[in-house]
Design a protein with these regions (language model features):
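A beta-strand edge to alpha-helix "cap/lid" segment located at domain peripheries
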Residues: 61-132
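Short, flexible active-site loop motifs that bind/organize anionic cofactors or intermediates
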Residues: 9-10, 43, 115
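Generic alpha-helical secondary-structure signal
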Residues: 9, 23, 55-56, 128
C-alpha cells in the first residue's frame, strides 16, 4: 500500500481504534503539536509505539466529539504522505467548539505509519478547553 493510502486508511478507521492502530508501526513516533509534553495542553507531546498512539487516541476519544472532518488533499511519494484539511470538534467538558485547519506529514515503512506529525491551531485548541 502506498503512503497516501496508508494515511487515508488510518484516518478512515479512527472510529475503530484497533483498526486505526493496525496502520501504526510498532516503532512509531506520533507528535501532537509539540515534541515535548506541556502544561499548556495534555494532548501535546510525542507518543511512541502502538501503545503510545493508543494513549493519544484515547485522549481524543475522551475529550473530542468530532462534528466535521474534511481531507482537502493528500500528496505522497514512495515513503512520505502529506495531507491537509479542516475539522470541527465539540469539547466534551466545556461544550465549546474547536475548529481549525490542519496538516499532517507522515513517513510510512512496511505499510505502516512510522512518523506522524500533526499541525493545527493550538491557540484555538487551548481556548476551547478553558472553562469560563
Amino acid at each position: 500500500m502506498k503512503p497516501d493510502q496508508v494515511l487515508l486508511q488510518y484516518f478512515h478507521n479512527l472510529v475503530d481504534m484497533d483498526k486505526a492502530l493496525s496502520y501504526v508501526h510498532k516503532d512509531a513516533a506520533f507528535i501532537a503539536a509539540f515534541e515535548k509534553e506541556s502544561d499548556r495542553h495534555h494532548f501535546y507531546g510525542t507518543y511512541y509505539g502502538i501503545e503510545g498512539v493508543r494513549t493519544l487516541l484515547s485522549k481524543f476519544q475522551k475529550d473530542l466529539y468530532t462534528q466535521e472532518f474534511e481531507i482537502n488533499k493528500v500528496l505522497a511519494d514512495e515513503t512520505t504522505a502529506l495531507a491537509w484539511g479542516r475539522f470541527k470538534h465539540r469539547i466534551q467538558h466545556t461544550g465549546k467548539i474547536f475548529e481549525s485547519y490542519w496538516a499532517v506529514v507522515c513517513d510510512v515503512e512496511d505499510g505502516k505509519i512510522k512518523y506522524f506529525r500533526g499541525f493545527e491551531d493550538t491557540g484555538a485548541l487551548e481556548a476551547a478547553f478553558l472553562i469560563d
